[in-house]
Design a protein with these regions (language model features):
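A solvent-exposed interaction/effector surface
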Residues: 1-128, 157
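Binding-site signature for planar aromatic cofactors or substrates
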Residues: 127-157
Length: 157
C-alpha cells in the first residue's frame, strides 16, 4: 500500500513529467526536532520547478554521506538503518549535522517481483581519523551533490 503523501506527490509530479526521468528520485528525508521525528516525502526536481498547494520546494544539502544500498522488504528498513549506524561507527565515521534520507531506486515502489524495495540509506557523516580508514570502508562514503526537492510532509510521524 502506497502512503497518501507519496500518492499526493505523484499526482502533482505526473502531469509535469517529473516521475520517470533518470534524474527524478523519490526520497524520504528525516528531520529530528529534539525527540520528535518527522519525515518529508520528496522527489528530486530541476531547479526551475516550483511547488504549489501542499507541495513545497526545498534543498537537500550536499556533503559527505555514508550510503548503504539495500534490496529489502519495507519491514526490514529499521534494521537496515541500525546496521548503517553500526557500520559508520565501525569505519571511523560519526553522524554529523544534516538530514538522513532514503533514496528509492524504483518508482513506482510496488513493481518488485518479491515485494522488496531497492533503497539507498544515506547518513551525513564526518571522518574521525582518516588514517584509520580501511580501503573497503571508503566505498560506503560518497560526496553527494545538493539536490532540489519538491516535498510533502508525511502524516503520523
Amino acid at each position: 500500500m502506497i502512503p497518501s503523501s507519496i500518492r499526493k506527490l505523484m499526482q502533482w509530479a505526473g502531469p509535469k513529467g517529473l516521475i520517470n526521468g533518470p534524474a527524478n528520485k523519490l526520497i524520504s528525508v528525516y528531520q529530528h526536532e529534539g525527540k520528535e521525528l518527522s519525515v518529508d516525502i520528496g522527489l528530486t526536481v530541476p531547479q526551475e520547478v516550483e511547488g504549489e498547494n501542499e507541495i513545497s520546494k526545498g534543498l537537500l544539502s550536499g556533503g559527505l554521506y555514508a550510503i548503504g544500498h539495500f534490496e529489502i522488504g519495507t519491514d526490514e528498513i529499521p534494521a537496515a538503518w541500525s546496521l548503517m549506524y553500526t557500520l559508520t561507527s565501525k569505519h571511523q565515521c560519526k553522524p554529523c549535522a544534516g538530514k538522513s534520507f532514503e533514496i528509492y531506486q524504483s518508482i513506482p515502489l510496488d513493481q518488485h517481483p518479491q515485494d522488496k524495495c531497492m533503497i539507498d540509506l544515506c547518513i551525513p557523516v564526518q571522518m574521525i581519523d582518516l588514517k584509520l580508514i580501511e580501503e573497503k570502508a571508503i566505498s560506503i562514503l560518497t560526496e553527494c551533490d545538493t539536490a532540489m526537492l519538491a516535498s510533502v510532509t508525511e502524516e503520523g510521524y
